[in-house]
């Protein structure tokens, strides 16, 4: 961690390929000396998803940079386009799906950064979530 870092370039980002997206972590403790926020740029290929899950100890904002995504918050969903966002309250089940033919790029902003574990809980195999998007390909 660089406690003096206040600016983060593309080369400073911590990259990680999750089962859902290529994650580019721009704000977390090993990147900047932050106390409250996490920021990740997520690059989701066409016909992929981050299936239903929840963050028991964090709130989240999803902000679309490019492409469009099918964003679920609870049992509601909307197609979000560039410049649009969704707020996910702490503990709310949600999922991000890209049923489209173009890449989806979005920012996920989570707080607080130092929340206790578990940070994420998979809900995709539990009802009613397992039935809501069962036609979408499973994450491999």
Model-derived regions, located:
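Conserved short histidine dyad/triad with adjacent acidic residue
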Residues: 23-27, 40-55
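Short beta-strand His + acidic residue motifs that chelate non-heme Fe in jelly-roll/DSBH
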Residues: 51-52, 71-72, 88, 94-100
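Glycine- and acidic-residue-biased ligand/ion/polar-headgroup-sensing regions
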Residues: 57-59, 63-69
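Short acidic-glycine-tyrosine-enriched beta hairpin
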Residues: 75-90
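A short, N-terminal "cap"/entry segment at the start of jelly-roll beta-barrel domains
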Residues: 1-36, 122-140
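Well-ordered beta-strand scaffold positions
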Residues: 42, 68, 76-78
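A generic "binding-loop/recognition-motif" signal
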Residues: 57, 76, 92-93, 102
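A short hydrophobic beta-strand segment most commonly corresponding to one strand
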Residues: 41-42, 87, 101-118
């Amino acid at each position: 961690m660089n406690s003096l870092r206040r600016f983060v370039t593309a080369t400073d980002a911590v990259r990680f390929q999750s089962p859902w997206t290529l994650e580019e972590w721009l704000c977390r403790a090993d990147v900047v000396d932050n106390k409250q926020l996490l920021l990740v740029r997520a690059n989701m290929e066409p016909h992929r998803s981050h299936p239903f899950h929840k963050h028991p100890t964090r709130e989240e904002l999803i902000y679309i940079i490019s492409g469009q995504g099918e964003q679920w918050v609870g049992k509601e969903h909307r197609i979000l386009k560039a410049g649009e966002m969704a707020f996910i309250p702490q503990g709310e089940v949600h999922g991000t799906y890209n049923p489209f033919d173009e890449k989806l790029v979005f920012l996920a902003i989570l707080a607080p950064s130092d929340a206790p574990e578990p940070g994420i809980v998979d809900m995709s195999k539990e009802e009613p979530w397992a039935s809501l998007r069962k036609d979408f390909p499973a994450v491999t």
